[in-house]
Amino acid sequence: MEKESQENSTRPDASSTVFSSSKSTCASPSYLKEAGDLISRLPDDILQLILSYLPTRLAIKTSVLSRRWRHVWSDTWSLSFHRDRPDAPCINRILDRYRAPKMMSFRICSCCRAACISRPDTHADIDSWINFAMSRNVENLSLYLDEDKYDIPEFLYINSSLKQLYLDFGCKKDFISLNPKCSVSWTSLKNLSLYHCNISDESIAIILSGCPILESLLLFFCKKLKVLDLSKSPRLITLEITRRCRMEPTQLVAPHIRCLRLINSEKPCALVDVSSLSQAELDITAYAIVDNKLEADFHQTMVVKMLEKCQNVEKLTLGANFLKMLSLAELRGVSFPKLKAKALILETMISRYVIHGIVKVLQNSPDLKKLTIHPMGSAGSYPIPEEHIDIYLDSHGLNWDPSWSSEFKNTSRRNVESKQVASFLQLVLKTISTLELIVARLEGYIKGRRFVELRQMVPMLPRNNDVSIVLSSRRKRFRVT
């Protein structure tokens, strides 16, 4: 650092000065060099850990800093070649220079289109990269395979080091089939995620039989699977399924599952056995509405049946579309099951289209202690259009409750008022008396002046019980009562 007299004599040139956090001092180039040297003095393990969080192409650029940095990247614990990745020949050269005997994570996105990179990947390229990662006993493997007619190599199905496997075959018209022609042995695998693939009942059974300690399974837009039977996987406790229109599975047998996230589609998925379930997140999608006709009768039946299978769940999350269909079911007088939920999360904007369903769920949850309201869109950004719900109501001679219809009419984030949120909270307090805590996560939904107004309104709400209300807006939380 310069002496104090020199610091105060002239103002340093902006091109060579960076202001530090102190108001009275500045960082000169010599100071920055010293700071840089301090970083370079860190142990290799620390530097490699830092670089492992960067895309590999950026980590390699640190090699020009000094001799000390020249080979640090080549011993990092992970390699990542994603969207802005280099060509296959360049990747091969990088792998040739990689020296770490053990790899924690390998992530690669293949590209079969010449527009993406100068030379599209060949199947041989992809096979060699997978083989390289396996030769370093990789634990977390993520493959984004935007390829046509690519078959997973048989050697991938036999591996004892993999703990997490992520396979995404790209959103193409014709999905790639995951069809192991050999036995599967993933003896250390705990988390398996499959995106955009064809997988039959037989194939998933073969895969599961080779994963004795699998704990988590994710299926996103998977076809061909009819019955997902997890009864022989006692350690598999977390399941996430997102189904598109007319996609599978259609039956779920999962007696050991404790946590379920199911985003259903127009085609039903029967929950045959989910008897151990303690947490569930449920919603439906609206990918295909033909001739402006919403199959609301079918959806109402489906959501009520799903709710019945989750009667014993202690933590329940319901999405916007799910609540819209529950509201229609309530208007038609459909019987709702009694719920044992102690914590309920509502992921929906506040509107007349969900109020009836919310009130009925609250009335049927006598053990509820905590309610979280998180205004957000529907699952997968495919909300059921409200004009289709209006058409359905008109055709069946149904009407919303007049008081709720006017008070909760607006659904747009731009139109929401603090009074509307306060009225909703008041409705909740009037509906259920067992609540101990209400958390309203309003980030991005109501802010600025309206949020301040809401904070002033909430303490004035009438209530018959001692319930705390927490309002959250972006980074700040306010316990107002």
Swiss-Prot record:
SMART domains: FBOX (SM00256). Signal peptide: none annotated. The keyword Ligase does not apply. LRR repeats lie at residues 118-145, 196-221, 295-320, 350-375, 413-439. Gene3D superfamilies: 1.20.1280.50, Ribonuclease Inhibitor. Residues 14-28 have a biased composition (Low complexity). Residues 1-28 are annotated as: Disordered. PROSITE patterns: FBOX. Residues 36-84 form the F-box domain. CDD domains: F-box_AtFBL13-like. Transmembrane segments: none annotated. Keywords: Leucine-rich repeat, Repeat. One of its GO terms (cellular component) is cytoplasm. This is F-box/LRR-repeat protein At3g03360. It comes from Arabidopsis thaliana.
